[in-house]
C-alpha cells in the first residue's frame, strides 16, 4: 500500500537497450510495451489510482518516419491486444496529447477504448502520446481565449488541460539514466518528487518500482512550506 495518488513514468532507454542486445529499435520499443503489460498488475496491487506513461512525445515526431510509423503502429497493436484484459481488470483508459495528428482510424480506436472503459474504477491508465506539456498548456490557453475569458486563473488552466481530472503528480520516475523531464507534465508535476534510474525501461521490474516508492516514502514533501 502506498500514499501515492499519481505515478508518472518516462519510459526511457528502449532504443539503447536494443543496441546493447544487438536488436533493432523496433524490437526495443516492443520490449518496452511488453514491460507495461508485465508491470501493470503490480501498479494495481499497489493501489495507485492514477498512472501516466510517457509513450510518445510531441518532439518524437522529428524522428525517422520508420520509427514514428512503428511507434504509432505499436499503440494500435497494444490497444487491440490488451483492451479486453485492461477492461476486465477494471482499468480506465485515458489518452492525452495532440491526437488530431494521428490517422483517423487510430483516433477512432482510442475513442473506443476510452468509451469502453469509462466506468472502470480500479486504476486510471493515462497514455501520453503525441504529447508535450508546453503544447498542452498552449492548447489550454487557446481554449480559454476561445471562450472569451479576460482574466485567467490557475483553475481555468487546470480545467482546460487534456485531462482536467488528472491529480498532481506525486512521484515521477524516469528510467534510462537521463536526468531531465523532457516536456512531460510540467503543470501537473510542479511539486512532484523525481526519481531517476540507470536501468533501461525494458530491464525495469517490480523491485525497481518498489525501490522508487520506498525512496519516495522517505522524503518530506513541504510544497514550499516549512
Curated annotation (Swiss-Prot):
One of its GO terms (molecular function) is ditrans,polycis-polyprenyl diphosphate synthase [(2E,6E)-farnesyl diphosphate specific] activity. Substrate binds at residues 13-17, 25, 29, 57-59, 61, 63, 174, 180-182. Gene3D superfamilies: Decaprenyl diphosphate synthase-like. GO terms for biological process: polyprenol biosynthetic process. Keywords: Magnesium, Metal-binding, Transferase. It comes from the Bacteria. Homodimer. HAMAP family: ISPT. It comes from Rickettsia prowazekii (strain Madrid E). Catalyzes the condensation of isopentenyl diphosphate (IPP) with allylic pyrophosphates generating different type of terpenoids. The keyword Transferase applies. It holds the Pfam family Prenyltransf. The active site is at 12, 60 (proton acceptor). Belongs to the UPP synthase family. Binds 2 magnesium ions per subunit. NCBIfam families: uppS. InterPro entries: UPP_synth-like, UPP_synth-like_CS, UPP_synth-like_sf. This is Isoprenyl transferase. Its cofactor is Mg(2+). Mg(2+) binds at residues 12, 193. Its EC number is 2.5.1.-.
